[in-house]
């Protein structure tokens, strides 16, 4: 064998080895890239496959805010979304019991929310109670927040055989009580609380020597003084918005204060944005990002027709959800402010979520209290097209709250 032949064979062997190693390297590189893509693109799928809860898991991300209302195959006046609680629930304020006060139709109870592209996990009261054992679930906001709180109380109590065990820690009655209410589930050592704070920030007297037209001020840079009670909560659901309008602020002599100075030129939505910045600072400074699951619920739509709440607006003729999307109101401007602030917080507190219920609620013009007020209410009192009959629409909000907690592996063992 001459030198040329030896060189050719060596070259061939060398090239073959290179190609072999190159093929193996390319195969391993491809496998690595594929694995990385799967991890990055489908983290929720990975979580669903590798973790489990005592009841169920959500295996993929879902936008529960988009979908449609569908009529259930079978229902009754005491069954909402299969939860089986009715107006007899002792945790309902009398003002939310529409049938008790004369509403005859029950069709508004016959609907369930169906998200696009996925299913809403069935609410499991026993599971949520067990996950929340030795904990606190806290609602903070206006009376629409109370609407949601009472809904959750009734939903959770269905898993308790002896409901008389559940009690208010200070002995306060639910009906007609304003302010702070804390209901204890003794077997789970769990409290489910409502704290009234329509603005979330402080509202009080104006600074000394303020003009006479300034009766009160909303201090947009000072968080609610009762907020120290909320520290350490496991789940917090905030809401605000219905008091952020001119009717309930500047037209009543309530102006906005910042840095201990009243700013009479500050607009309502500018003030709302500043108050959310104050809320953001409190959450990031006072809450443990490893423990507290924080939600800010979006704006709950109103459905006054032929007027506003104080000009004869009505909704008592509505008995079914809206079916024409073209008739829906545009998204509330409040939501844009809320969403933006939450996005700013994610890098420091990953357990902060936007509980978006506006679009699905916009369809439900049929679910309001309307004229079915408590006995003794004056006939001249405007219809209530803001609050909701219970059982009713807020039950769906709590189903979505539960689904989002599942997707976040809330207190998974």
Swiss-Prot record:
Regarding the membrane, this protein is recorded as: Single-pass type II membrane protein
Q: Where in the cell is it found?
A: Membrane
Membrane-crossing residue ranges in chain numbering: 22-42
Q: What's this protein's function?
A: May act as a bridging protein that binds pectin and other cell wall polysaccharides. Probably involved in maintaining esterification of pectins. May be involved in the specific O-acetylation of cell wall polymers.
Miscellaneous remark of the record: Contains 2 motifs that are conserved in esterases, but it is unlikely that this protein belongs to the catalytically active pectin esterases.
Say which domain of life the source belongs to. Eukaryota
Write out the residue ranges of the motif DCXHWCLPGXXDXWN motif: 384-398
The family assignment reads: Belongs to the PC-esterase family. TBL subfamily.
Q: Which GO terms describe its cellular component?
A: membrane
Please tell me where this protein is predominantly located: membrane
Name the source organism.
Arabidopsis thaliana
Q: Where is this motif: GDS motif?
A: 141-143
One Pfam family assigned to this protein is PMR5N
UniProt keywords (A-Z) are: Membrane, Signal-anchor, Transmembrane, Transmembrane helix
Q: Which cysteines are joined by disulfide bonds?
A: none
* Molecular function via GO: O-acetyltransferase activity
Q: What is this protein called?
A: Protein trichome birefringence-like 9
């Amino acid at each position: 064998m001459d030198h040329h032949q030896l060189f050719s064979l060596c070259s061939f062997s060398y090239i073959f080895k290179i190609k072999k190693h190159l093929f193996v390297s390319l195969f391993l590189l491809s496998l690595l890239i594929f694995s990385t893509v799967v991890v990055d693109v489908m983290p929720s799928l990975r979580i669903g496959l590798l973790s489990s809860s005592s009841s169920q898991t959500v295996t993929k991300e879902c936008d529960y805010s988009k979908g449609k209302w569908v009529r259930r195959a079978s229902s009754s006046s005491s069954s909402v979304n299969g939860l089986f609680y009715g107006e007899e629930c002792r945790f309902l304020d009398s003002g939310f019991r529409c049938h008790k006060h004369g509403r005859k139709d029950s069709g508004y109870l016959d609907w369930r929310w169906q998200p696009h592209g996925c299913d809403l996990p069935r609410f499991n009261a026993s599971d949520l109670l067990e996950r929340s054992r030795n904990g606190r679930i806290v609602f903070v906001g206006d009376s629409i927040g109370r609407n949601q709180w009472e809904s959750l109380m009734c939903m959770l109590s269905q898993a308790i055989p002896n409901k008389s065990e559940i009690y208010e820690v200070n002995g306060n009655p639910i009906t007609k009580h304003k302010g702070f209410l804390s209901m204890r589930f003794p077997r789970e050592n769990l409290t489910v609380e409502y704290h009234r704070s329509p603005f979330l920030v402080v509202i009080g007297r104006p600074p000394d020597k303020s003009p006479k037209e300034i009766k009160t001020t909303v201090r947009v840079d000072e968080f609610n003084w009762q907020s120290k009670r909320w520290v350490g909560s496991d789940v917090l659901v905030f809401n605000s918005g219905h008091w952020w309008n001119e009717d309930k602020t500047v037209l009543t002599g309530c102006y906005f204060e910042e840095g201990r100075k009243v700013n009479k030129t500050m607009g309502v939505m500018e003030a709302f944005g500043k108050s959310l910045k104050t809320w953001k600072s409190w959450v990031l400074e006072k809450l443990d990002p490893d423990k507290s699951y924080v939600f800010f619920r979006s704006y709950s739509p109103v459905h006054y027709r032929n007027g506003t709440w104080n000009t004869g607006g009505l909704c008592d003729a509505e008995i079914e959800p809206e079916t024409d999307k073209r008739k829906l109101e545009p998204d509330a401007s409040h939501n844009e402010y809320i969403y933006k602030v939450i996005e700013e917080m994610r890098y420091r507190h990953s357990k902060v979520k936007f509980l978006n219920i506006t679009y699905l609620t916009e369809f439900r013009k049929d679910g309001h209290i309307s004229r079915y007020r408590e006995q003794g209410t004056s006939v001249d009192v405007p219809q209530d097209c803001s609050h909701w009959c219970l059982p009713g629409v807020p039950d769906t909000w709590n189903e979505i709250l539960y689904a989002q907690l599942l997707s976040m592996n809330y207190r998974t063992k």
